[in-house]
Amino acid sequence: MRFTIVIPVALCVLLIGLTAPAQRKKGYARKPKPLPVVSAIDTEALKGLITQPRERPLLVNFWATFCDPCRDEFPDLVKIDKDYRPQSIEFVTVSLDDFGEIKTSVPQFLVSMKATMPAYLLNVTDPEPAINFIDRRWQGDLPATYLYNEKGEVVYKHIGRVNTAELREAIEKVVKKSD
């Protein structure tokens, strides 16, 4: 009686084991995609990133994985990135997550959003100097979106979930001025 159960089970295990390598060769077993690189950035490097001379406007979005409005607006920002970055603007994101998230939840979130824009994580013990550099009136609320013209001047800012139509309008205006 035992053999009538053991033999069919053993045959099934053997067949599954023999077909697994064939499935891998056919591309059925996928390798996990590598996570995007999220670069650490400190206050001085952030200042340099924003103030460096550039040929195109710069869009910067400050966000965090623990921020619901940030997560909600991210698909819209990814669409804006795809529509404008290749030819019109530079676009970077700066996460204010804990530095320990640089290789885990931050890149995993970016993959889930299909984000391709350069990504940074603010690596400071005190974010106040970075926040004050960006905007003395900004209290650090997230998300925060800033659009800079080629001269490094803020031409659009929004604290909270961005209105996509307003942001697109601001991008169109600054791009037309730079042409």
Give the role of each language-model region.
Residues P8-I16:
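Bacterial N-terminal signal peptides
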Residues D141-D179:
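Thiol-/selenol-based redox modules, centered on thioredoxin-like
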Residues Q108-L142:
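Short, internal strand/loop/helix patches
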Residues V37-L58, D81:
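A short beta-strand-turn-helix
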Residues S88-K103, A115-T125:
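Thiol-based oxidoreductase modules, predominantly thioredoxin-like and allied folds used
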Residues R56-L58, W63-F66, D98, D141:
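Short pre-active-site segment immediately N-terminal to redox-active cysteine/selenocysteine motifs
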Residues F62-K79:
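Conserved redox-active cysteine motifs that mediate thiol-disulfide chemistry
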